[in-house]
Amino acid sequence: MGLRSTTLVLAATSSLLGGLIFGYELGIISGALLMLKTVFQLTCFEQEALVSAVLFGALLASLIGGFIIDRSGRRTSIMGSNLVVLAGSIILIATSSFWWLVVGRVTVGFAISISSMACCIYVSEIVRPHQRGTLVSLYETGITVGILISYAMNYFLSAVNDGWKYMFGLAIIPAAFQFIVILFLPSKPHTLNFWEQDSDNGFIELEEAGESGEFKPDTYDKQYTFLDLFRSKDNMRTRTLLGLGLVLFQQFTGQPNVLYYASTIFRSVGFQSNSSAVLASVGLGVVKVASTLIAICFADKAGRRILLLAGCIVMTIAISGIGIVSFMVELDSHRDCGSIRSKNTSYGDSNASQLLGIIHAGTPTINTKDNLAHQLAMVIQSPSLSNSAGSKHTASMFPNSTVPPAGPDSNYAILNWITLLSMMAFVSAFSIGFGPMTWLVLSEIYPADIRGRAFAFCNSFNWAANLLITLTFLEVIGSIGLGWTFLLYGGVGLLAIAFIYFFIPETKGQSLEEIDQQLSSKRISKRRETSKGVRKRPSTGPPYQRVGKSNWT
């Protein structure tokens, strides 16, 4: 295996490990919280604070992480995030205080947010155009795999004394591996031939330069300030709006909340035992992984726009279908953080039910992207749904809804299965479209000098929108009902389809310099400009010239 092939494998491994850490940290809290609630006698507020800590850490990282990534370099930022994950994990393992648990989770959230941004940007800069979609999308695959691993660890460690410490501590392993892998990758990639198609097969030429190295090709000479993101210079304001549109539509189509009802839906269609419930949740996770792999295979063939459009169309149909069905079959929407462990429910039963609540990543997920604040901390009530107290509580919260029986009614069986299939379609569509493609496009559309800050700026809106959607979900349901809530998400999906179709340009097969040239024009074409000779546009500046290796030797 040559040097370039080795570097390619290492870049892919680093991207996959980065996503795995992100997904694992998002998913592991679901099982750990069950133990922590008992060990630390956590109140509802404390559970919410503990689960939301990762979100706030990630939001903080999004606000300042861009400056860190642009100033310190991508590779250094990734390595630093690994060390911060190590520090956060040690705090979580060693602590005997609730507030130190919160500090540990904030620390971990900060680290995985920095890593998610730096990984996507670094990999996009280090690989050739025809490999960029695949390699960057590997991060999303890592997220889904990380969540699946967290499912398994939650289940197998639930009966172990101090199992929550092992759950948190296991994150050190992939972080250590990524730290080692990144040591063998270049400090700062530089293109010597603009990734031309007729260059050597495989990997771009790299110059091993220091993190502060000044060598850059002509198209990398431009310097930007943060305020340039809101100015007309090189069409930066439009690029910023494109990035914000993607991350906001990703959240406002309802993906942080739709899977909150996974547990109810699974029970409705007959997944009521411990083993079948866990199997169902893992099965849905497997669907998510498989869908992400499909996105990887087609990102550099079908293109970003096609996958975004296809995914968003299916998501809109699926979420609207769930909304329509919910008018005919009333789903239980009660959740009570005090009932995470019912006195009538075994620990294993609670763990199985809890596992069903976190079946999504985004997001750089990175997911992220999960309904963390409520989906995990305020878990659905125990399987004993038909007790009078629970029914009375639910009736008071949702006067127009009814509590379904523990088992599926034969009259509603078909509708319940339609709901389940719609949810699986929603998960698959997100994993093909918004999940990986949003972060891939964000890593491509900004100039190198400001790419880290621009990515982080958009990512901060992603986390903020996630929190907003999560924290207002119950209030929206109480105001307009579950069915109309999901139909509202469907309406947002229609707007997202129009936004993608009319404004998002195709970037497949183009070098980052070619994409920058395309987006610098006042009018952004949504059609792909082929890399085999980018369509020439009238220009008042110096003509674009191909630079070969001979020019630099």
Swiss-Prot record:
Signal peptide: none
Glycosylation, residue list: N274, N344, N351, N400
Main function: Facilitative glucose transporter required for the development of the cardiovascular system.
Regions that span the bilayer: 16-36, 49-69, 83-103, 106-126, 133-153, 166-186, 241-261, 278-298, 306-326, 414-434, 463-482, 484-504
Keywords assigned: Cytoplasm, Glycoprotein, Membrane, Sugar transport, Transmembrane, Transmembrane helix, Transport
Cytoplasmic compartment spans: 1-15, 70-82, 127-132, 187-240, 299-305, 435-462, 505-553
InterPro entries: MFS_dom, MFS_sugar_transport-like, MFS_Sugar_Transporter, MFS_trans_sf, Sugar/inositol_transpt, Sugar_transporter_CS
Protein name: Solute carrier family 2, facilitated glucose transporter member 10
Pfam families for the chain: Sugar_tr (PF00083)
Membrane topology summary: Multi-pass membrane protein
UniProt topological domain (Extracellular) ranges: 37-48, 104-105, 154-165, 262-277, 327-413, 483
Residue sites binding D-glucose per the record: Q250, Q251, W439
An individual GO BP term: D-glucose transmembrane transport
Entry GO CC: endomembrane system; membrane; perinuclear region of cytoplasm
Record Gene3D superfamilies: MFS general substrate transporter like domains
GO MF term set: D-glucose transmembrane transporter activity
Chain residue ranges for the region called Disordered: 522-553
Catalytic activity field: D-glucose(out) = D-glucose(in)
Family note: Belongs to the major facilitator superfamily. Sugar transporter (TC 2.A.1.1) family. Glucose transporter subfamily.
Compartmental location: Endomembrane system; Cytoplasm, Perinuclear region
PROSITE patterns, per database record: MFS, SUGAR_TRANSPORT_1
Domain of life of the organism encoding this protein: Eukaryota
